[in-house]
Amino acid sequence: MSITRSLSKPAIRDLLNKPSWSITSLLHNPAGIETPKIDEAVVKKMLRISGLQSTISKEETTKIKKALETQMVFINHLYEDDNVANNNSTNNDHFRLLPGDHRQQEPLNLQQIEESISSLKPSAEKGEIGNFTIGKLRNSPFFVVKARQ
């Protein structure tokens, strides 16, 4: 039993080849919606955190600011809910740069690394099953263990 009419291969190909929307239409900010503002300090901080050169020209800073604003407009569109009144400031929370997230940590030394390795325990939440032996692996239907020749 068919719910809809059957389509031939050429009809399906034509249907899929015909664009129904364009991403460029989503990159332009609709009228009446506030464009997220990004200042130069945010751009420099993002570049520094990303490990990129943060001493760039004004033109490059302007280009990056415009690109980030365009991305935020697009992401705002992705999070739009047609059934609920749109609150334009809600998505700005996703782009906060919190100082605590990017604090420089104290470098680990060999002793600290060895201690953390020795205290590791398998986590069932992560799907870790603990220690295993070659005998257990050979009997498991999901693994094939072959001896080296």
Swiss-Prot record:
Its main location: mitochondrion. It holds the Pfam family GatF. One of its GO terms (biological process) is glutaminyl-tRNAGln biosynthesis via transamidation. Its EC number is 6.3.5.-. One of its GO terms (cellular component) is mitochondrial inner membrane. It catalyses: L-glutamyl-tRNA(Gln) + L-glutamine + ATP + H2O = L-glutaminyl-tRNA(Gln) + L-glutamate + ADP + phosphate + H(+). The keyword Transcription regulation does not apply. It is found in: Mitochondrion inner membrane. Belongs to the GatF family. Allows the formation of correctly charged Gln-tRNA(Gln) through the transamidation of misacylated Glu-tRNA(Gln) in the mitochondria. The reaction takes place in the presence of glutamine and ATP through an activated gamma-phospho-Glu-tRNA(Gln). Required for proper protein synthesis within the mitochondrion. This is Glutamyl-tRNA(Gln) amidotransferase subunit F, mitochondrial. It comes from Meyerozyma guilliermondii (strain ATCC 6260 / CBS 566 / DSM 6381 / JCM 1539 / NBRC 10279 / NRRL Y-324). The gene is GTF1.
